[in-house]
Amino acid sequence: DTNTFYILCGWMTEKDALAFQKDIQNDEKIFCLMEDQQAHAKKKPPTKLKNPKLFKPFEMYVKMYGLPAYNEMDPTWFVAITYSFIFGAMFGDVGQGLILFLGGLFLYKTKHMDLAGIISCAGVFSVFFGFMYGSFFGFEDVLKAIWLKPMNQMMDVPLVGRLNAVFVIAIGFGMFIILICMIFNIINSIRNKDTEKAWFDSNAVAGLVFYGSIVLTVGL
């Protein structure tokens, strides 16, 4: 008699691997060998994103620009928070934000559309900033602004003069995002044991010190 053997090799998450091992433990015809040491692998492990349900829809954007490597940080949560925050700051309106939230939530629950989930999250931030701005369906005299009126609020900027407050805050927030991204790059370099890149890359420690000093100088 000729015996036929099938050999299957692949990657599994630890949770799935343990479940698979449990399923086949009583099958004498199946022999399973598991290796959890990445150093022995000839190829780099694939990346599987794992995020809370609230951030799941934003994985679409991460996959669009390329998945992080196995040892790198998953930026989904950061993308979700910053995207929703920036959208809300730009489109702050209680009424319209509420429509986006409800419409997005309905489509996400019924059609399971990732984009609808993103719109729903953005709608929540839009409502929040709508209260901050005192805007309701474009009318700014219905609600009292908790924070400021975007079109009228001005502030003094050294060496420049008076500028719109929202414009100045947007620039400051953009600088903050750049600094955070540099920190992420440093963390990824350390995880990949690339010390040279962590210290001397333009988006690592060297760039962080240079850019951070400029930001502090301008701020002071």
Region spans (language model):
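Conserved, carboxylate-rich catalytic/transport cores that coordinate ions
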Residues: L18-L220
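Coiled-coil termination/hinge junctions
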Residues: D1-F20
